[in-house]
Design a protein with these regions (language model features):
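Active-site recognition of the HExxH zinc-binding catalytic motif
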Residues: 47-60, 74, 78, 247
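Pan-zinc metallopeptidase signature
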Residues: 112-214
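Positively charged n-region of N-terminal signal peptides that target proteins for export
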Residues: 1-4
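Bacterial N-terminal signal peptides
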Residues: 7-17
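Sec/Tat signal peptide C-region and signal peptidase I cleavage site
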Residues: 19-23
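An active-site-proximal "capping" alpha-helix that borders the catalytic cofactor pocket
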Residues: 67-84
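Short pre-active-site segment immediately N-terminal to the catalytic Zn-binding motif
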Residues: 30-47, 62-63, 258-267
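Catalytic zinc-binding patch centered on the HExxH motif and its immediate surroundings
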Residues: 24-26, 226-264
Length: 267
């Protein structure tokens, strides 16, 4: 896969000092902490976009899915980032795994009957699946990450088979995807409350760059619409009826707060 997205850390280090110290929930944090918060939010947003691209490809290319489509979309997103083999993409995967872990922790890792029936795996499982594929793809590069998640050496060794299966499956299905998809990118106004989230998302450039990957990397029928908007919930969607990836500004805000809650203030 092409490395199209700009070095995120460099962009955010330029953005972070420009943010007012009292900007929404970033008051009381140092410039470095603010940069870390923004990096985490953008990297999780990036993983989410690739997850929605996974749904798009499953829909438009009629990709076979055995099991939950949500798990398949996570695996496609992880595979795309692993294929880039860059420090930025590796950091994005680490942040995505941590994002699922922190999300689960914020709900006390509660997963009731309705959750099990919903089609989504538990957040902690999604985090560990990402890490398993990481260490399965490159044990020397990601051993420390897997150890930090308390994945046993025995399981780390078998993660290689998990990765090989995903690589063979996804790589084979997307081997000759073509090029030339029509893609339209739209940013809608976020409003005053979500101004910071909109600014962070726009400045990161990830929306245009993932859209460009779809444009150059696949030949899909019709026009694919990328829309960033206010949704009244922290989420992202793929709508097969309109062939549209919808990203909610509230998700950026939620991710910033999620990471900020883990940091001490005033350092």
């Amino acid at each position: 896969m092409r490395r199209l997205f700009a070095p995120i850390v460099a962009v955010l280090l330029l953005l972070a000092p420009a943010l007012p110290a009292n900007a929404q929930d970033l008051s009381g944090f140092s410039k470095q902490q603010r940069a870390d918060i923004l990096r985490f939010a953008v990297n999780n947003s990036l993983f989410t976009l690739y997850h929605e691209v996974g749904h798009l490809l499953i829909d438009k290319l009629d990709l076979p899915v055995l099991g939950r489509e949500e798990d398949a979309a996570d695996n496609i997103a992880t595979w795309i980032l692993l294929e880039k083999k860059t420090p930025d993409s590796n950091q994005a995967l680490e942040d995505a795994a941590k994002g699922w872990l922190l999300t689960g922790r914020s709900f006390d890792d509660y997963f009731g009957d309705d959750d099990y029936a919903s089609g989504y795996s538990p957040e902690r499982h999604r985090a560990l699946q990402i890490v398993c594929l990481m260490v399965g793809a490159d044990g020397s590069a990601f051993r420390k990450v897997a150890n930090a998640y308390s994945i046993s050496p025995e399981r780390q060794n078998t993660c290689h088979f998990d990765y090989e299966l995903i690589d063979r499956s996804v790589g084979g299905l997307l081997e000759k995807p073509g090029t030339g998809t029509r893609v339209k990118v739209t940013y809608e106004e976020a409003g005053e409350r979500l101004k910071l989230a909109e600014r962070v998302f726009r400045t990161s450039g990830i929306f245009e760059e993932v859209a460009e990957e779809v444009r150059r990397g696949y030949r899909l029928s019709g026009t694919v619409q990328f829309t960033a908007t206010r949704c009244d919930e922290p989420n992202a969607f793929y709508d097969p009826a309109t062939t549209e990836i919808i990203f909610c500004y509230e998700l950026v805000e939620d991710l910033m707060q999620l990471y900020a809650n883990e940091l001490p203030r005033g350092r």
